[in-house]
Design a protein with these regions (language model features):
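Catalytic loop of short-chain dehydrogenase/reductase
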Residues: 1-5, 24-78
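C-terminal helical subdomain
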Residues: 64, 79, 86-87, 94, ...
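Conserved sequence/active-site signature of Rossmann-fold short-chain dehydrogenase/reductase
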Residues: 37-39, 92-93, 97
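A short, exposed helix-loop element centered on a Lys and neighboring polar residues
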Residues: 16-17, 71
Length: 137
């Protein structure tokens, strides 16, 4: 449990704090945090949500915490012009799931790359999966 929270929550905060001075110097800075739809509190509050039964204190709760941290970043940075967005790569084959995901890491990275490359007029404050499909917070 600690390793998952260290990666998904505390590690993200440490990188954010370390990189913020550099991001503040950029005219087109952005933060793209990688979460999961299973971290959506809105979805998990619905007993009909397919992943509702698996919501627990390790992975899903760590992603819900990451979502909250991302929201805090958005609030902190809203007057700076730094874009902050959250993406879900989907059920991607990784070491965490024993490579049992339904898609390759190349496909899982599509939304991360799309959001990272948004133009200066692109949105901030979004939570999306591939093809800009909105995920409820």
């Amino acid at each position: 449990m600690r390793a998952v929270w260290e990666t998904n929550v505390f590690g993200v905060l440490a990188v954010y704090q370390a990189m913020l001075p550099l991001l503040s110097e950029s005219s087109d800075a952005r933060i793209v945090n990688v979460s999961s739809a299973v971290g959506s509190l809105t979805s998990n509050a619905d007993p009909a949500y397919p992943y509702h039964p698996m919501f627990g204190p390790v992975y899903p709760a760590s992603k819900a915490a990451l979502n909250a941290i991302t929201l805090a970043m958005m609030v902190e940075l809203e007057s700076t012009g730094i874009k902050v967005n959250l993406v879900s790569p989907g059920f991607t084959k990784t070491n965490l799931n024993g490579y049992e995901g339904t898609q390759s890491d190349e496909k899982g990275s599509r939304e991360v790359v799309r959001v990272a490359l948004l133009g200066r007029d692109g949105p901030t404050g979004t939570f999306t999966r591939w093809e800009n499909v909105t995920i409820p917070w």
